[in-house]
Amino acid sequence: MTKLIFMGTPDFSATVLKGLLESDQYEVLAVVTQPDRAVGRKKEIRITPVKEVALSYGLPIYQPEKLSGSPEMEAIMNLGADGIVTVAFGQFLPSKLLARMNFVVNVHASLLPKHRGGAPIHYALIQGDKETGVTIMETVKEMDAGDMISRRSIPITDEDNVGTLFEKLAIVGRDLLLDTLPAYLSGDIQPEAQDPSQVTFSPNIRPEEERLDWNMTNRQLFNQIRGMNPWPVAHTLWQGERFKIYEAELADGEGQPGEILEIGKRQLLVATGEGALVLKTVQPAGKPKMTISDFLNGAGRNLAVGDKFGN
């Protein structure tokens, strides 16, 4: 039985961890995840999804603020593990740790070499990719630059957003790792180097990238909105305050960018640089997330055709 250390943080990682724990080929000796964080206005302490799984299985848990040079790293190196599996861990692994293991592999939510970085699912949607997938690769010091062990793709539909793709790709990643790892460890798979000419980067979304520019086409804005749903959420301005848009649909229409073209009982049509969008799910400042009909019956009841979103 192969002895592993698992490193990961979000729900995506937790799905893969469960797959390894349910397999009879691997023994997970310990889990390494990010420290507990205070979140929200009430600053409530929240543990990571990976920690939740580890606690339910009674696994040893390490949560270093920084792995390099930490007492936790020394303890990890002395566990006698054969290797490490990382999935959206959120920290670089020190060279000293990489050198100690027989293997270190990473599960990455893109079809490498495209979309290296921390937000591959977001950018696959924002850039209008027709497909995405998961790559299993060898871990090296450079971010997401290791040789590729295996890849598996899935189509992206107009109904997808970050949330749906996270769920789909977590299952793909779990299954691909379980399908691939035995052959890789036995030497039956020869990893393939990434083509440097095809490398693109998808770093974490910056706050300024969340704002909608109504001069863009309806397709570009549609992709931005779903590429940030359910987080960090695209927004515009309404009455000088932030107005979040979770969901929209493509539509025909012509007017000044950001102009309201039509108001119905359950519909709000807004012009873009080319075409229009029907807003479906929104969140005005200081209000909860709501359907467009609830908005039009409440905070937005005084909206009029010709009013504009944005600056």
Swiss-Prot record:
The reply on keyword Transferase is: yes
Keyword annotations for this protein, in alphabetical order, are: Protein biosynthesis, Transferase
| Record bears the keyword Nuclease | no
Q: Recorded GO terms, molecular function?
A: methionyl-tRNA formyltransferase activity
- InterPro entries linked to this entry: Fmt (IPR005794), Formyl_trans_C (IPR005793), Formyl_trans_C_sf (IPR037022), Formyl_transf_N (IPR002376), Formyl_transf_N_sf (IPR036477), Formyl_transferase-like_C_sf (IPR011034), GART_AS (IPR001555), Met-tRNA-FMT_C (IPR044135)
| Reactions mediated catalytically | L-methionyl-tRNA(fMet) + (6R)-10-formyltetrahydrofolate = N-formyl-L-methionyl-tRNA(fMet) + (6S)-5,6,7,8-tetrahydrofolate + H(+)
Q: EC?
A: 2.1.2.9
EC main class here is transferase
Q: Which family does it belong to?
A: Belongs to the Fmt family.
Q: Which HAMAP family is this protein grouped with?
A: Formyl_trans (MF_00182)
Q: Which GO terms describe its cellular component?
A: cytosol
Q: What NCBIfam families would the database entry show?
A: fmt
* Function (record text): Attaches a formyl group to the free amino group of methionyl-tRNA(fMet). The formyl group appears to play a dual role in the initiator identity of N-formylmethionyl-tRNA by promoting its recognition by IF2 and preventing the misappropriation of this tRNA by the elongation apparatus.
Q: Which organism is it from?
A: Streptococcus gordonii (strain Challis / ATCC 35105 / BCRC 15272 / CH1 / DL1 / V288)
Designated name of the protein: Methionyl-tRNA formyltransferase
Q: Which residues bind (6S)-5,6,7,8-tetrahydrofolate?
A: S110, L111, L112, P113
Coiled-coil blocks: none
Q: Pfam families of this UniProt entry?
A: Formyl_trans_C, Formyl_trans_N
